[in-house]
Amino acid sequence: MSHSEAMKAVAVKAKEASRKIACADGTARNAAIIELAALLEQEKEFIFAENKKDLDAAKERGLDQARLQRLEITPSVLEYMIQGCNEVAGQADPVGEIEKMERRPNGMMVGKMRIPLGVIMMIFESRPNVTVDAAVLCLKAGNSVILRGGSEAIHSNLALASLLQKALGKADLPAEAVQVVEVTDREAVGELLKLDEYIDVVIPRGGEGLIRAVVSQATMPVLKHYKGVCHMYVDSDCEIPEAMDIIKNAKTQKPAACNSLECLLVHEDIAKEILPSLGVLLGACGVTMKGCPRAMPLLGPKAIAADFDDWGMEYLDLILCVKVVSTQDEAQDHISRYGSNHSEVILTKNHDRAMRFIREVDASMVGVNASTRFNDGGQLGLGAEIGISTSKLHSYGPMGATELTSTKFVLLGNWDVRN
């Protein structure tokens, strides 16, 4: 069977299953998710053994330590997956919810009902836990899912998918609602991205190169963010000790996260007061500071001059660009030019400036006096998330189960005809 035929067979199975899973009762979908949590605990030795196959092969191929860490399923990672299943199962069912039911002047009732998107394809790198996270959210929202993880995690992904399918079967739901692409070469992905007749949306998670490749080939809508170039603007009217704590958290808590701070903009009236201390604080944390000409003398002797390419760079590392600005206008113009619509924050005691920042800055999360690290489904009250979208269509920001649904109009008439 050719790649084209094999991938079409996968998509057809997912499409057929999507009709059944969409009509299934929410109780059955929750039962499958709870059963999966139990299976993850019961079959943990099997999971660890399959994951070890991937780790051993990755070490032989010379994968770097960061990618090996993302690939490994540790006991704590597995426990997090189990907790995520139970948390999602406990959430309200988004499917079938009717919103804004209103009576029209002609007496008819009109509203909107939440419905599944259909078939969602997830393309992701390295992290096998995404197999469970993505599938559980898709199932919660009544969707079927096609999972295409990185080739380096093939044994782990297949093991986890087998448990997902087993859990679906025990809940009397179609096992075909979860499909894993077993072919590891990239040609298979290209074939799937042509199948908009069967696949309703694709969500890529990984590096910017992967995401741009998916966008360039996909014939169906893509929910994505290319990168997280997150800014923080320190206003002249600011609590300096608290601001320094927030900046440290945003940069150093998890520098490889897409919601970590990459560029700090500081008002000139407060720069001399905050930047020398900040240079010492972040320097002690191993952060390399790259500054504009006005920031360089204030950041300490280890600071490096920023060049043009540094603005707009997603480092995902202990590197921070710092720019001194004269006005809030200049700060917001910089964000507009170099930002990626991900997470942007202002630190200020001035209410009017904060509200202006919220109104005018375009990002999936705009914050006041808080770390950029809060742009996360769990922190924003969504529970687990399938990813963060910086595409305003169909969703903007972290995507939980509700964001994996759409709406249809519901019309309740009384034997009405249109005049």
From Swiss-Prot:
GO molecular function: glutamate-5-semialdehyde dehydrogenase activity; NADP binding
Positions of transmembrane segments: none
Keyword Amino-acid biosynthesis carried by entry: yes
Catalyzed chemical reaction(s): L-glutamate 5-semialdehyde + phosphate + NADP(+) = L-glutamyl 5-phosphate + NADPH + H(+)
Entry's localization field: Cytoplasm
GO cellular component terms, semicolon-separated: cytoplasm
Pfam families xref list: Aldedh (PF00171)
InterPro entries xrefs: Ald_DH/histidinol_DH (IPR016161), Ald_DH_C (IPR016163), Ald_DH_N (IPR016162), Aldehyde_DH_dom (IPR015590), Glu-5-SA_DH (IPR012134), GPR_dom (IPR000965)
EC number: 1.2.1.41
UniProt main location, coarse: cytoplasm
GO biological process: L-proline biosynthetic process
Pathway: Amino-acid biosynthesis; L-proline biosynthesis; L-glutamate 5-semialdehyde from L-glutamate: step 2/2
The entry's keywords: Amino-acid biosynthesis, Cytoplasm, NADP, Oxidoreductase, Proline biosynthesis
HAMAP family per the UniProt record, alphabetical: ProA (MF_00412)
Protein family membership: Belongs to the gamma-glutamyl phosphate reductase family.
Protein purpose: Catalyzes the NADPH-dependent reduction of L-glutamate 5-phosphate into L-glutamate 5-semialdehyde and phosphate. The product spontaneously undergoes cyclization to form 1-pyrroline-5-carboxylate.
Name this protein carries in UniProt: Gamma-glutamyl phosphate reductase
